[in-house]
C-alpha cells in the first residue's frame, strides 16, 4: 500500500514539476480583468455568499450519545411523574439498525409504540424523528427503546404530553452502559426538533453527510456507490464546525460561491465584454438548482465547480493554440484541466461525461489549429495521455485512502479500487431498481 501511494504522489508531483519547468517562459493570453472587474467580482461574490449563508444550518451539536451496539441493548426513559404522552422526538446519529419502542403504563402494562422511522426502508442518519402516540387515558411511567439489530445512536430526546408541554423531569439509564445519560434530555425543549432543514439531514444528505462523518473518523463508510473525494471535502467542514447541519453544508456552499467569480472570469475571457460577464454571473447566481443544491451536502455542486474549471482551462488551451502558441506553452492549461477532470471524477462519475468533449477539443486543437507533423502529433498525444488519463487516475486512486484506511483487512489499493469500480457499476446499472429513498 505504501509503495502504491508513493508512486501515485510521485506521478502528480513529477508531472507538475515538468509542466512548470517547461512552460515557465511561455506567454499566456491575459484574462483582461481591470479594477472594475475585480470590484464587480467582489461585490457579486460577497453578495451571493451572504445570501447563501442565510439559514444554511444550525451549529447545534449533541455531546451525549447512547450507543445501541448489539441486540438486546435497551434505553429506559422513566417519567418521574407519570403522564399522558402525546409525542416522542429523538435525534438519531448512525442509524443502520432495527429497533422498537414500547411504553409501560401505571398499571404495569407494556405496549408497543408504532415508530414510522423504524420502517422507512432507509436509515434515518443524523436527523430528528417523530413518534405520535395514540390518544389514551393511560398514564405512562416508562418508555423503552430496544435494539433488535445494531447499530443505533441516540443523541437527544424530546418528549411532550398530550397538551404539547415539554417533559424534562426524566431519569434515563441503559442496560449496556453505566454512563451518565442525562445529557440526552435538555432542561427546555431543544431547538429545531421538528425535523427541520436547519437541524436534520435532508434527502441524500442522509447518505453523504453520514459517509463524510464516517470517513473523518475512520469508520466503515455507508456510501460506496460514488468516489469518495466529494464526501472527504464535506468531512472537512465537519472537522471544522462539527457534525452539525452547518458543518456538513459549508463546503458545498463554498463551492457554489466560488462558481460565481469563476463564471465571471470565464465569461469575460470568452466574450471579451464586461456586460456578458455580468449577465452570465447573474444567471448562475439566480439559477434555482445552483442555489438549492449548493446549500445541501450533495456532490453535485462540488463536481460542477471542477467541471467548469476544467472547461475554463481547456478554453485557455484553445485560445493559446489559436494564437499560434507552441504546444509547450499549453502545458499549464492542459495540466490544470487534467487536474480539474481528475478531481471531478473523484467526486462523481457524472464528470466522466466531459471526457468526450475533452477528446474533441484536444483533437481540434492539435490537428485543426496546430497542423502538426506526425512526430509533433505523437508527442502531443503522449503528453495529453499523461495529463488526461494518468494524472486523473492517480488523483482518483489517492481519493480512496481514507476509505481503505477504514477497512482493516485491505492493504492493496489498486485491487480495492477495482472491486469498488465493479461494485459501483453494478449498483448504478442494476441496484437502483428496487431501492428505497428518502
Model features per residue range: what roles?
Residues 280-285, 292, 341, 345:
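Short helix- or helix-capping micro-motifs
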Residues 206-216, 222-243, 253-254:
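Short hydrophobic/aromatic helix or loop-helix immediately within or flanking a transmembrane segment
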Residues 164-212, 393-438:
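Aromatic-rich transmembrane-lumenal/periplasmic boundary elements in polytopic membrane proteins
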Residues 258, 263-286, 304-305, 322-329:
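Transmembrane-helix signature of polytopic, membrane-embedded enzymes
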Residues 262, 302-327, 336, 340-341:
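Specific aromatic-rich, kink-prone transmembrane helix
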Residues 248, 252, 289-303, 350:
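Short acidic/glycine- and proline-prone juxtamembrane loop motifs at membrane-interface regions
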Residues 313-324, 341, 354-393, 398, ...:
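Perimembrane helix-loop-helix junctions
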Residues 246, 250-271, 309-313:
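Transmembrane-helix motifs of polytopic, lipid-linked glycan transferases
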Amino acid at each position: 500500500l505504501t509503495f502504491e501511494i508513493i508512486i501515485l504522489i510521485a506521478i502528480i508531483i513529477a508531472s507538475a514539476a515538468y509542466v512548470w519547468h517547461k512552460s515557465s517562459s511561455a506567454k499566456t493570453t491575459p484574462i483582461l480583468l481591470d479594477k472594475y472587474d475585480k470590484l464587480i467580482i467582489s461585490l457579486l461574490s460577497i453578495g451571493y455568499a451572504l445570501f447563501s449563508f442565510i439559514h444554511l444550518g444550525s451549529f447545534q451539536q449533541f455531546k451525549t450519545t447512547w450507543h445501541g451496539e448489539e441486540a438486546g441493548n435497551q434505553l429506559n426513559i422513566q417519567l418521574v411523574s407519570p403522564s399522558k404522552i402525546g409525542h416522542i422526538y429523538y435525534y438519531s446519529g448512525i442509524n443502520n439498525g432495527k429497533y422498537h419502542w414500547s411504553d409501560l403504563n401505571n398499571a404495569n402494562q407494556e405496549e408497543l409504540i408504532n415508530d414510522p422511522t423504524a420502517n422507512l426502508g432507509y436509515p434515518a442518519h443524523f436527523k430528528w424523528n417523530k413518534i405520535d402516540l395514540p390518544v389514551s387515558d393511560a398514564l405512562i411511567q416508562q418508555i423503552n427503546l430496544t435494539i433488535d439489530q445494531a447499530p443505533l445512536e441516540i443523541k437527544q430526546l424530546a418528549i411532550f404530553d398530550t397538551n404539547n408541554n415539554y417533559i424534562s423531569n426524566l431519569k434515563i439509564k441503559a442496560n449496556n452502559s453505566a454512563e451518565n445519560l442525562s445529557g440526552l434530555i435538555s432542561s427546555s425543549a431543544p431547538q429545531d426538533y421538528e425535523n427541520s432543514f436547519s437541524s436534520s439531514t435532508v434527502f441524500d444528505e442522509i447518505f453523504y453527510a453520514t459517509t463524510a462523518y464516517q470517513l473523518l473518523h475512520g469508520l466503515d463508510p455507508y456510501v460506496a456507490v460514488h468516489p469518495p473525494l466529494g464526501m472527504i471535502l464535506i468531512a472537512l467542514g465537519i472537522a471544522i464546525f462539527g457534525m452539525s447541519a452547518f458543518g456538513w453544508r459549508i463546503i458545498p456552499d463554498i463551492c457554489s460561491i466560488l462558481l460565481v467569480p469563476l463564471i465571471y472570469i470565464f465569461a469575460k475571457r470568452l466574450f471579451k465584454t464586461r456586460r456578458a460577464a455580468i449577465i452570465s454571473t447573474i444567471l448562475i447566481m439566480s439559477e434555482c438548482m445552483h442555489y438549492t443544491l449548493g446549500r445541501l451536502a450533495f456532490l453535485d455542486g462540488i463536481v460542477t465547480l471542477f467541471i467548469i474549471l476544467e472547461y475554463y482551462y481547456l478554453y485557455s488551451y484553445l485560445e493559446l493554440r489559436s494564437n499560434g502558441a507552441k504546444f509547450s506553452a499549453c502545458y499549464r492549461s492542459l495540466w490544470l484541466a487534467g487536474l480539474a477532470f481528475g478531481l471531478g471524477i473523484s467526486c462523481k462519475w457524472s464528470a466522466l461525461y466531459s471526457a468526450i468533449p475533452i477528446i474533441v477539443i484536444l483533437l481540434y486543437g492539435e490537428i485543426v489549429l496546430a497542423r502538426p507533423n506526425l512526430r509533433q502529433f505523437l508527442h502531443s498525444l503522449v503528453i495529453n495521455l499523461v495529463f488526461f488519463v494518468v494524472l486523473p487516475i492517480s488523483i482518483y486512486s489517492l481519493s480512496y485512502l481514507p476509505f481503505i484506511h477504514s477497512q482493516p483487512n485491505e492493504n492493496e489499493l489498486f485491487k480495492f479500487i477495482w472491486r469498488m469500480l465493479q461494485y459501483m457499476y453494478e449498483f448504478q446499472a442494476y441496484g437502483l431498481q428496487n431501492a428505497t429513498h428518502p
